[in-house]
Amino acid sequence: DYLFGRGIDFEIINYCLEQELIIESLPYHNAVFIGYDENKEPKYAAYRATNQSRIMGDCTGSKKQYSFRLTAENTGEVHLFECAIDLLSYATLMKLEGKDWRQLNLVSLAGVYSPKQKIEDSKVPVTLGRLLEKDKTIRRIVLHLDNDIAGRKATKALQTILSDKYEVVDDPPQYGK
């Protein structure tokens, strides 16, 4: 109900439930977003309250390099989001535009960080670093980070440190943060 209430497409929700990418925790009924390694072992989990409270975070022991994702192989590009909900919203929008969301490489960064004072010294997020190491076909990185201060700073940092090797596109949400 929570994800559907957020406007996420029913087919996408069902896919995530069937693949155990999203589960419901008990007794609080939080939505839990799971990331897996290559052996289909869960390595990352983020939770989000499904009620009006803003309780959310990473589960203890989570490894961000395996963050929540919906991946397609050999697409040549990756779409990056601050969180799982943003990723699922984008997949829904693509479906509404008639595009096959299953053919897109969608990855949550599991949050963004403040770049270094000297922006060139900023580091690539572990999630993205691992993905770029594993998938040598990626040439284009599309950033769908929020329009808030943290999202804009992280976008600027990633554009600065990655643009010598990749085409880096800034495509923030048109509405909302």
Where in the sequence are the language-model features?
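Conserved mixed alpha/beta catalytic, RNA-binding, or beta-rich assembly cores of soluble enzyme
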Residues: 80-85, 110-114
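Short, well-ordered amphipathic alpha-helices
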Residues: 86-95
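Flexible, charged surface loops at secondary-structure boundaries
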Residues: 26, 70-75, 133-137
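Acidic, divalent-metal-coordinating active-site segment for phosphoryl/phosphodiester hydrolysis
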Residues: 85-86, 154
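Basic, glycine-enriched DNA-binding surface that flanks or lies within the catalytic cores of DNA
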Residues: 1-71
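Short active-site oxyanion
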Residues: 75-79, 140-141
